[in-house]
Structure formats: structure tokens, C-alpha cells
Regions:
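Active-site or pore-adjacent capping/gating segments
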Residues: 71, 268, 364, 382
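Conserved small-domain helix->loop->beta segment predominantly found in fold-type I
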Residues: 279-354, 358, 368, 372-382
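Conserved PLP-enzyme active-site core in the AAT-like
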Residues: 5-14, 18, 38, 74-77, ...
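Conserved N-terminal alpha-helix of the aminotransferase class I/II PLP-enzyme fold
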Residues: 41-87, 110-111
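Glycine-rich beta-alpha junction loops
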Residues: 30, 223, 268-270, 322-324, ...
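N-terminal "arm"/small-domain region of PLP-dependent enzymes with the aminotransferase-like
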Residues: 1-62
Length: 382
């Protein structure tokens, strides 16, 4: 134990990598440098500061500006901004850009804590909307356009609508309907799309927030796509929130010394999607189909929208992201897992995402997940 306590963090990380664990968590690249070769190149020799020929994130006009323009084209936004402080920084910037101190904001109760931090920092007055609960899996359901429309009638002073879609569990809300309800009152919509950077890139996936009329959306590249942890995009669409204000707030809520390693991984991710996105997403969808087929016969595991649950109707849920695999274990399955040496929490229901689905993972990983032969974890299942 003393020897373990004395090991440096990088040594522990290296040992974890060499142990060959199957990643059931973020980041979306799954340590797959073969898929995204640029990630393997991002070491200390490429870690620089703002040199003229490498552009400046806070005043972009060169390679960074070009990378963000390419991202805007891919996601269909008026403007997209690289975020080195993750979706957290993007949410803070977006909320600040769309509001003034003392404004009333309509907020889904299951928003990320960054939204609550923004409310505190910006001195906002929140009006909370409670999503329905899907009883079978115990998950927060979808926010509905009717809820939003009624809340805007009841609170005519609201200046912004904020909600997550998809959620961590893959629950998608009717963003087109919500935007229609909000825009009828002249109110902009911010979608926390942290878990949805992949949406809209394949017909099997729901459309993204920008395609449905959202004014602002924040998407974590590192959660679902091959980019380094802490990388995200802030998308701006529509004309209800001025672009200069969005740009200014991204500068306020990001480091003045943004990492070129993080920015290079974002630029590389965008280029990968441009060049190989269609084939990669087709392969991803094919493996999700294989996953569905592989779990059909499982008796002690239910997966939201997959396997025996495919095509099921869940009250309170508008749609599901098929890339998400929230799972329900009965108590008996947890006991079986513990006997096999798995470190499962001592609770009846364990919902988590099998994140080998996050990005086009290799076939052997898909088989390991579908057959239930994952490695034991050292801690609780995420």
C-alpha cells in the first residue's frame, strides 16, 4: 500500500492503461489512437504558447478561426467556439451572454451543476421546470414544449430557456417544439448538448440542437467523440443572442492561456469528421445494431431502448439517443456480479452508460460488452 501511495499520477495512469481495462466511461476516444492518430502525437513537444503563426483563441484570425469555421459548417451553426474549459465553461459563457443580472430564466430541474453555478455567478432568478420521471428505469424524462409554453405564459419576464438534451441517460427532448414555443415569445433557447456532440451525423441518431432552431448549444467533444478531456464546442445560431457578446463571454470564462494540445485535438476531431465521418458513423451504428442483437437473450439485464427494450414506449420520454445504453440491474444480477469479482455499488439499481458505444469502438470491444465479459473495475461502475 505504501508503494502504491508513493507512485506518481502519470505512473498510475500508465499502469491503468497497460492493465487493459475496458473503458466504460469517458472520454470518447477510448484510448484508440488508431482511430484518431492525432491524439497520439499530442505530447510535450507540441505544447506551446500563443505564437503568431499558431493564432490566438481570444482573437482568432488564422488556423484556430479556420478550425472553428469548419466546426460551424459541420454542426450547422452561425458560429462555433472552441472551449478548453469543457461544456462547463461553455454553459457559463452562453448563459452570461444571453442574460443580464437579475433576469428570470426558465431552467429544467435536472440541468448540470454548471447551470446552477451560472445562476449564482450572474445573479439570475430561476424558474424551475420538473421533467417527468420514467418509472421503470428511474430516469428524468423529456421536457415538453407544452411545459415550456405554459411556463412562459405564467412567467412573462423570462429571458432564457435552458435544459439538457440528450441527458446523461440518453433522454432527448423535443427541441424543435420547445424552440417554437420560446421563439413565439422572443425568448432564446440554450440546449446543454454535452452528451450529444454526435447527434445529427447519422439518420439513426436524433437531430442536433442547431438543426432544430436552438439559439445556443454546448457540446462536449470529449464525451462522445475522439477529442481530449476538457474539450467542447459552444454553438451559436439564430439572432436573439448577439455573436459579439457570445465571443466576449467565451473569453471571460476560459483560460487566457488555452492549451494548444486541447485545441489541436478539437481541430483534429473536426477534420476527422469531415474526412471520415460518414464511414465512422455508419460503423458505429452497425455495432450498436450488433449490440442490440447480442443482448436479446440476457435475462438479468435491461437496457433502455435496446435489445428486448428496442422500440418500447416510455411514458414521459420524447425520444432516445440510441448511442446511450442506460442499464437496469435487478438485485440478483448485482449479487451475481459481486460473486464474479465485479465492484458493483450495493444498491438495487445501477444505471450507467456502456461507453464503448461512445464513438466507433473496435469490434472486439463491442463483443466484450455484448457478451458481458467486461473486466472487473477497481471502483464503482460509473
Amino acid at each position: 500500500m505504501a508503494e502504491e501511495a508513493g507512485r506518481a499520477l502519470w505512473e498510475r495512469l500508465e499502469a491503468h492503461h497497460k492493465a487493459g481495462y475496458l473503458s466504460l466511461h469517458m472520454p470518447g476516444h477510448k484510448e484508440n489512437a488508431a482511430l484518431a492518430p492525432y491524439l497520439a502525437r499530442l505530447g510535450a513537444e507540441l505544447d506551446i504558447t500563443e505564437l503568431p503563426e499558431f493564432d490566438d483563441l481570444h482573437d482568432p484570425s488564422g488556423v484556430l478561426a479556420q478550425g472553428m469555421d469548419r466546426a460551424a459548417k459541420l454542426w450547422g451553426s452561425r458560429k462555433s467556439y472552441f472551449q478548453v474549459n469543457g461544456s462547463t465553461g461553455g454553459l457559463l459563457a452562453a448563459i452570461r451572454a444571453a442574460t443580464r443580472r437579475g433576469d428570470q430564466v426558465l431552467v429544467a430541474r435536472h440541468c448540470h451543476k454548471a447551470v446552477y453555478h451560472a445562476i449564482e455567478l450572474c445573479g439570475l432568478d430561476p424558474v424551475f421546470l420538473l421533467p417527468p420521471v420514467e418509472e421503470t428505469f428511474g430516469l428524468a424524462g423529456s421536457l415538453s414544449p407544452e411545459q415550456v409554453a405554459q411556463a412562459l405564459e405564467d412567467h412573462p419576464g423570462v429571458k432564457l430557456v435552458v435544459y439538457p438534451s440528450p441527458t446523461y441517460d440518453g433522454v432527448v427532448s423535443d427541441t424543435a417544439g420547445i424552440c417554437a414555443a420560446a421563439h413565439a415569445k422572443g425568448v432564446p433557447v440554450l440546449v446543454d448538448e454535452a452528451h450529444g456532440a454526435h447527434l445529427g451525423f447519422h439518420p439513426a441518431f436524433p437531430p442536433g440542437a442547431m438543426a432544430q432552431g436552438a439559439d445556443l448549444a454546448v457540446a462536449s467533444l470529449h464525451k462522445m467523440l475522439p477529442s481530449l478531456t476538457q474539450t467542447a464546442l459552444l454553438h451559436a445560431g439564430g439572432k436573439l443572442v448577439p455573436l459579439p457578446q457570445v465571443a466576449r463571454q467565451t473569453g471571460i470564462f476560459q483560460s487566457s492561456s488555452p492549451s494548444y494540445l486541447l485545441m489541436a485535438s478539437m481541430d483534429g476531431c473536426v477534420r476527422l469528421l469531415e474526412e471520415k465521418g460518414e464511414a465512422l458513423f455508419a460503423a458505429w451504428h452497425r455495432r450498436l445494431t450488433e449490440f442490440d442483437q447480442g443482448i436479446q437473450g440476457l435475462r438479468h439485464l435491461r437496457v433502455l431502448g435496446h435489445g428486448r427494450e428496442a422500440g418500447a414506449h416510455y411514458p414521459g420520454i420524447f425520444a432516445l439517443d440510441p448511442a446511450s445504453t442506460s442499464q437496469d440491474f435487478p438485485a440478483s444480477a448485482c449479487q451475481m456480479g459481486r460473486r464474479a469479482g465485479w465492484a458493483l455499488p450495493r444498491i438495487r439499481r445501477v444505471s450507467f452508460q456502456v461507453t464503448a458505444r461512445k464513438g466507433p469502438s473496435s469490434p472486439w470491444k463491442s463483443k466484450k460488452v455484448s457478451r458481458g465479459r467486461t473486466h472487473p473495475t477497481r471502483g464503482s461502475v460509473p
